[in-house]
Amino acid sequence: MFKATLKGLTPNTTYSYRLKYSDGTEEYISDAVSFTTEVATALVNGNMDDWYQSGKTWYAASEGYFTENGGSFWDSSNPGTTTGAGALVNVNPTQGNSVTVHTAGGKSAELKSQYASAFGIGKFAAASLYAGSFNSLVGTNGAKIDFGQPFTSRPTRLHGFFRYTAGTIDYVGSNTPSNLGIISGSTPDVCSIYIALTTRTYQVDNTDTSTFIDYENDSGIVAYGELPVSECVSTDGLWKEFNIDLKYRTLTTKPTHIIIVCSSSKYGDYFTGSTGSLMYLDDLELVYGDTPTLK
C-alpha cells in the first residue's frame, strides 16, 4: 500500500490529486480525488491583551466579545469571590497585567493564589484561567465549574509562555489525597497547564471529587496533553516557553469542545496551595500542521 504525507497545506482549502503509476511501458493515471483541509481555529484572546470588568468581576475578554457572546471564552475563579455571597470577599485572583508581560505593549494574565475570606469565613483560592464558565457557588465550601467551549478543529499542540513564583504550601484541604505527600509549611507549590479536546462539556463540583474529570480514561476525551509537573516550578523571575503536545486517542472522532486549564496552584481543586504562588501567562496559541501524536 502506498502512503504519502503532505505538509504545508493551507487550512480550510480544497485540493485535488491523482495517482500516477508507470510499469516502464505504460502509464496509468487515476481519476481526480478531492479533499478539504480543516479550519485552523485560533485561540480566542490567546495573547491575553483583552480584559473587561462586568460588575466587580474581571474577565479575559474584550467588551465587544463579552457583549456579543453573553460571556467570555475564558473564565476563572473570579466570579466565586466577586458575585453572590462571594461579593463580600470582592477580590479577583485572576486579572490582566500590563507591566509583567512577554510581549511589550500588551497584557498578560496574572494568577495569584490567596486566602479569600469575609467575616471570618474563607477558603484558600487558587487563581485559575480556563476555557469554560463559572456555574455557581456550593455554599461557602466551593463551586461548580462548567469546563469546555465549542471547538471542532484539531491542533497538534498548545504553545505559550509562563512565569511562575512558587510559594511554600500553607493551606492543605481536608480532601487532599494523602499519597501526594504534601506537608503544610514544607512542600513547595506547583502550577499546572493542560489542554483537552472533547466531545462534551463537563461540570465539576470541587467539593465532590467524584465529579473530577478522568482525562486518561473518560470516553469523551479525544486528545489530551499537560505540562509535566517537573516543569511546573518556579522560573526564577524569567519567562519560560512551553509546548504541550496533544496526544490523540483516535483520528476518526472530531471534537466538539476544547478545555484549557491554567492554575497557580495545581491542587487548588482540593483547596491546597500557597498564598505566595504567582503565575503569569502570555501569548498562548494553538499549533497546527505537525504530525499528530497518537496515544
Please tell me what each predicted stretch does.
Residues 34-155, 186-198, 204-295:
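Aromatic (Trp/Tyr/Phe) and Gly/Pro-enriched flexible surface segments
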Residues 9-24:
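Beta-strand-rich modules
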Residues 154-164:
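A short beta-strand element within beta-rich, extracytoplasmic domains
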Residues 22-40:
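Extracellular fibronectin type III
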Residues 164-171, 183-188, 201-204:
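Extended, low-complexity, turn-rich repeat/linker tracts enriched in Gly/Pro/Ser/Thr and Asp/Glu
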Residues 14-18, 157, 255-257:
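Short, conserved beta-strand segments of beta-strand-rich sandwich/propeller modules, principally
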Residues 1-10:
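Recognizes extended acidic, P/S/T-rich segments that occur
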